[in-house]
Structure formats: C-alpha cells, structure tokens
Amino acid sequence: MKAPILGTAVALLAAVLAAPAVATDWAADEADIRRQINESVVAFNRGDLPGHLAIYDENVTFMTKDGPRPGVAPIEKAFRENYFREGRPVQQLRFEQLAVRPLGPDAALATARWVLAGGEKPEKSGWFTLAWQRMPSGWRAVHDHSS
C-alpha cells in the first residue's frame, strides 16, 4: 500500500518541479507591449526619434535586404536618412492589424502593417515582425524584421 502512495507522491513532485517557476500575467504583458508600440508611433509622429526607438534593446538586430544590422545606431541612421527631414517626420506613421502573442513566459512576437501617409507623398506600407524579450528593465524589442 505504501509503494503506490509513495509513487504517486514522487510523480506529483516531479510534475510540480517540471512546471514553470513563475506564472506570468500574459494580459498585463501584452498590454505593456501594445502600450510601448503605440507610444513609439506617437513619438515618431511628433519628431521624437529617440522616443520612437525606445522600444528597442541596445543589442537589437534589424533585418535589412543586406542582412541583419546590430544595435540601435544603424536603425536610427536609416530612419533619419529615409523618414525625417530637419528633425521632423516626412510622413505620419500608423500601425494596423497589430497582433501580439506569447512565445513563452519571457518572449513575445508582435506583427502589424505599418503605413506612412501624408506629407504630399505617396502612401507607403509594409509589414513588420518584432521579437520581444522580457529584460530586467522590462519588455524590449530584440529583433525587427520590416518589409
């Protein structure tokens, strides 16, 4: 009789130890990521490029047609050259169809359509995928693939 009870206890202990140590509140995590993305758009549209780039971890990789570029500096340079004139955005940015989903307790994926409109220029649009990771400082984008 003791053997089945002991076996059950060992199986339960193994199941508990195999479970994630900390359960996360995904709804709060998703809301935080969405908030950061929305604040990034607002910053871009008011001409605050550092504010727009604040979502990125300092070691982010940005995928380009020529391959990945590491760090925030190349992203900032590309945005200044292509999307800003005299410290102001050439067009207004918006995101559509934003979806955020968990990849685990400390990782998430965000996808959306980006649209640049106005400024007496033709509208441009494409899609992006942002890989997010929970850092000691909070959620940060660690990889950006935009097309």
Language-model region placement:
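Surface-exposed, charged secondary-structure patches
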Residues: K77-P122
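Short beta-strand edge/turn micro-motifs at domain boundaries
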Residues: S125-S147
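A mature extracytoplasmic/lumenal domain signature
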Residues: Y56, D66, A99, A112-W114, ...
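Short, low-complexity N-terminal intrinsically disordered segments enriched in polar/charged residues
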Residues: A18-E58, P74
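A short gly/proline-enriched turn/hairpin at secondary-structure junctions
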Residues: N59-P70, F84-P89
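Positively charged n-region of N-terminal signal peptides that target proteins for export
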Residues: M1-P4
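Bacterial N-terminal signal peptides
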Residues: G7-A18
